[in-house]
Design a protein with these regions (language model features):
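Structured adenosyl-cofactor binding patch, chiefly the S-adenosyl-L-methionine
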Residues: 201-236
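Short secondary-structure boundary segments
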Residues: 44, 109-110, 174-177, 195, ...
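Short, ordered loop/turn segments at secondary-structure junctions
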Residues: 9, 69, 109-113, 219-220
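Active-site/ligand-binding-proximal alpha/beta "capping" segment
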Residues: 164-204, 212-215
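N-terminal positively charged helical leader segments and presequences
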Residues: 1-70
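Hydrophobic side chains in well-ordered alpha-helices
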Residues: 28, 90-93, 203
Length: 236
């Protein structure tokens, strides 16, 4: 991890934090090889970045004296609509999009998403939060994305999505579209990305009826996690 993240439950007082998570304690020892007196990059979830001096480290936890005096990186102005990936891909995808700066993510059901994916233990709040935090630690960011789940396509696209599009450019990435994905946008974007195999024609039509512009990344068919990274890097 490139950043040690604390939350308010870790706070001892105005300047001291107590890290108790066994996984991160092991990381401190084995990867950072941290010893008392070392200074490391730290942040407060939902707050500022800064540095922390390790005061003590034992089996019960690590105590840091912290100074939080820097803003986190600017978020991407994007609402990502992503067809729910396969469970083994979901963890990596959550980490990648968080590291890239996505702050609004909707995971939705589409025709080619297997219904069993929605019963995956990877969708528990604890698992999702764990992977979001790993993404923040990678990118040295502190603000968790908002993640919503839409297990029914039609009610979402008819009843909830239209109100979320005001003032935003809407794009749907899908193979075979006529327009190349634009570059370097400086406006809010809603970006829809389908599952492995893409959206079915009915789904594309429903997005286009709401004003979504169809875009592509070229002739190559990419895995979803690769396409997400490539699209976000190109758009912003």
């Amino acid at each position: 991890m490139n950043l040690i993240l604390f939350d308010d439950n870790d706070r001892l007082d105005a300047q001291r934090m107590h890290l108790r998570d066994p996984v991160r304690l092991r990381h401190l020892r084995e990867i950072h090889r941290a010893v008392p007196g070392d200074e490391l990059s730290v942040g407060l979830i939902g707050g500022a970045l800064g540095h922390g001096r390790l005061q003590s480290l034992d089996d019960t936890g690590a105590i840091f004296t912290v100074t939080l005096d820097r803003n986190p990186p600017a978020p991407l102005p994007v609402h990502l609509l992503l067809a729910l990936p396969r469970p083994r891909m979901l963890a990596r995808t959550l980490e990648h999009v968080t590291a890239l700066g996505v702050k609004q993510l909707t995971l939705l059901h589409t025709r080619r998403v297997e219904k069993s994916y929605w019963q995956s233990p990877e969708l528990t709040p604890e698992k999702v939060r764990h992977h979001l935090i790993l993404g923040l630690e990678q990118a040295r960011d502190t603000h968790l994305p908002s993640v919503t789940f839409e297990p029914r396509f039609k009610p979402f696209i008819e009843d909830r999505l239209p109100a979320q599009l005001s003032g935003r450019r809407a794009l749907i990435a899908h193979p075979g579209m006529a327009t190349t994905c634009p570059r370097g946008l400086d406006e809010p974007v809603t970006l829809a990305i389908g599952p492995e195999g893409g959206f079915v024609p009915y789904e594309v039509e429903r997005f286009e009826a709401l004003g979504f512009e169809g875009v592509h990344l070229g002739e190559r068919i990419l895995r979803v996690e690769t396409a997400v990274t490539a699209l976000l890097a190109r758009l912003f």
